[in-house]
């Protein structure tokens, strides 16, 4: 469903940037779906995202939840015919051979039951900190936070950042809108907003040991820092 076609333009801030709060509200008003998905537009979603959500919904282990996943960065240079099984198989093979899993802080989508996130702060789209808030807030209210990364492969089509009028550092971290998002989020929530409390793998759905979750974050910290250090030079 396209909110723009069914609902019209969502609310914007003074700089004309869309508000996530209005988009989430519009989605809840327009759809009676059990689960809503927010996803960045530069990724390729494969069918096992939906089958994974169906598995969790049928599980007796959790009721309400929020699921998330990291992306796999890949240079996609040719158009893909998803109606052709061979083309999809080739993509998956390319992902396996050449794809690079993004750092632990890079969440590419959120899927949550309709009873959650009905009212959120007025975060703006495309700036930092709101995504960390989603997971940190869920944890603060005891909502299961499920990491789909190991099972669900989400392909991020590598691109430049020429659409930005400034650096990635300004857009995501130091700019006015990023700082406003940070204020609304009550901080950056980097650790709590980048890890789950449950994991979905080929072996099923299981609750994580917090010691392992924290270890996973700290083990990936060097890659996160390398990414941030590149921000001032990426336009």
What are the residue ranges of the model-derived segments?
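Short, high-confidence coil segments that cap the C-terminus of an alpha-helix
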Residues: 32-33, 61-65, 143
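Preference for well-ordered, secondary-structure-rich cores of eukaryotic proteins
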Residues: 21, 38, 102-105, 154
């Amino acid at each position: 469903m396209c909110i723009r076609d069914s609902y019209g333009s969502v609310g914007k801030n003074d700089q004309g940037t869309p508000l996530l709060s209005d988009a989430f509200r519009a989605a809840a008003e327009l759809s009676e779906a059990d689960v809503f998905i927010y996803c960045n537009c530069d990724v390729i979603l494969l069918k096992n995202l939906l089958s994974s959500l169906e598995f969790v919904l049928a599980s007796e282990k959790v009721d309400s939840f929020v699921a998330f996943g990291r992306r796999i960065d890949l240079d996609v240079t040719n158009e893909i015919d998803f109606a052709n099984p061979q083309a999809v198989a080739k993509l998956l093979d390319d992902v396996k051979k050449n794809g690079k899993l993004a750092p632990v802080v890079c969440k590419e989508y959120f899927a949550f039951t309709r009873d959650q996130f009905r009212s959120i702060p007025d975060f703006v789209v495309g700036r930092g900190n709101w995504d960390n808030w989603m997971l940190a807030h869920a944890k603060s209210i005891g909502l299961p936070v499920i990491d789909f990364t190991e099972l669900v492969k989400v392909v991020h089509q590598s691109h430049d950042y020429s659409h930005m009028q400034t650096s990635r550092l300004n857009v995501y971290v130091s700019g006015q809108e990023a700082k406003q998002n940070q204020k609304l989020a009550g901080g950056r929530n980097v650790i709590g907003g980048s890890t789950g409390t449950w994991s979905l793998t080929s072996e099923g759905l299981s609750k994580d040991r917090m010691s392992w979750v924290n270890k996973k974050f700290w083990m990936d910290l060097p890659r996160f820092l390398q990414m941030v250090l590149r921000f001032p030079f990426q336009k």
